[in-house]
Amino acid sequence: MHTKSKRYDILLWDIDGTLMDFKKAEAMSLSQCLREIHIEPEQDMIEDYSRINLSYWKRLEKGELTKPEVLLGRFTEFLGKYDIKTDVKEFLQHYEEGLGHFNFIQDDSLKLCQCLKEHGFRQYIVTNGTVDVQRMKLRETGLGRIVDGVFISDELGIPKPQKAFFEICFEEIFGEKEPDQNQRSRVLIIGDSLSSDIQGGINAGIDTCWYRNPGEDNTESMPITYEITHLHQILDILYS
């Protein structure tokens, strides 16, 4: 661990696609659900679902859909595309249960977070994921015992990247919804989603760190404070 003075001391972590490998968990859970109804999953089916799922979450971020519309709508579209006859709500329930159990740690993130905790960093989870799934992940991986707090959009009543989401976070962290710039300068958000995490950081007036997954590009030329391709690169930023 570096020994220079810290530039930031409050970290806001995204879970899915950042601390944990969401695509792998998504593929495993979807495959399990399909096999339960006697359908052998193929790679193109999994990739189709992933694209459909992402499009629905982006519409949630823009305020075009509600969370229930996202959760059911993505499967209604996916199952309809492949003419799969099954109960959509039951399929969703089994899928969500799988997501909570299939936990794949990314870049040794738990050890990283534990190390940062031991060096005095305050760490918080900021996620749009469903409450039951995220709480299960936090419990089963032990991440919930490491971080200082958890902000789940369903519990807050508003999703990332909305400014109001972060105002609620700030109220718990700083005791006020609109902290001054000196306070905001202590905070760094780290996440893989440009539209949710990075835009959220911009809306909140805090610095951002984009965890760029392979093959992804900043096609919208969104202003980003930092960019990393491995989570442990965050140490160079925190102690620069």
What are the residue ranges of the model-derived segments?
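Helix C-cap/helix->beta junction micro-motif
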Residues: 82, 119-120, 204
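Short glycine/serine/threonine/alanine-rich loop segments
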Residues: 39, 121, 206
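Asp-based, Mg2+/Mn2+-dependent phosphohydrolase catalytic module
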Residues: 1-11, 114, 130-240
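Substrate-recognition element of Asp-dependent hydrolases with the DxDx(T/V) motif
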Residues: 90-92, 98-104, 109-141, 149-153
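Generic recognition of short, well-ordered alpha-helical segments
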Residues: 24-28, 107-111, 136, 163-164
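N-terminal helical cap/lid subdomain that shapes the substrate entry/recognition surface
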Residues: 4-107
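Short glycine/serine/threonine-biased micro-segments
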Residues: 61, 127, 189
